[in-house]
Amino acid sequence: MPPAVKAVTFDAATWRDLGPRMLELERQEWGPRAFSPREMRWQATNRDAVVMTTWDGPILIGFAVAGPAWTDGRASLLNVLIDPAYRGRGLVWPLIAAVERALFARGIRELDIDARVENGFADNVERHYGSRATVIEQDHPSPYGRQRTIRVRVAAKAGRRAPKATRSSRGGKRPAESR
């Protein structure tokens, strides 16, 4: 069974349950540069945050947190991590797509992503989002290594597969109707 993406609304009890694993993933990735427990808790429990998690059965294997930006209608992807043992399977995209759908439902139409350059994530973000992505700040130094800031136009149906083409009565292909 493929890993499942779930929305989580954080409160103090949820943080006590999931916070340690989120911090573990953060420290695995960033070592001494990892966000502090206080910062991670603020990100997850902020009332304006959107938190999505990825699970392999009972094991939390990834999460994404988006929070408010300084501009109306825009959010920032504050954190996104996948357990190193699960990387390379495309799990980050359904996770971010779930964040997008939740943001869209709240009226947010843009998501800023500070994407790491060194591991190829910045290039992958641009490739994945195509015309919905605009580089707003080229590769620049940060405490986390070189990053590229990419603004993504949020889509209501982010991550949903397009309907397959169907055959018309005349035998030609036509796209299935979508709304």
Model-derived regions, located:
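Acetyl-CoA-dependent GNAT
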Residues: 9-78, 83, 96, 102, ...
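C-terminal "cap" of GNAT-fold acetyltransferases
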Residues: 132-179
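Short acidic/glycine-enriched loop/turn segments that link adjacent beta-strands
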Residues: 71-73, 119, 141-147
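A short, internal acetyl-CoA/4′-phosphopantetheine-binding micro-motif in the GNAT/acyltransferase core
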Residues: 80-87, 115-117
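Short coil/turn segments at alpha/beta junctions that flank glycine-rich nucleotide-binding fingerprints
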Residues: 33, 89, 106-109
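Conserved active-site alpha-helix within GNAT-family acetyltransferase domains
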Residues: 117-137
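Conserved GNAT acetyl-CoA-binding A-motif
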Residues: 103-115
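Conserved acetyl-CoA pyrophosphate-binding loop and the N-cap/start of the following alpha-helix
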Residues: 86, 90-98
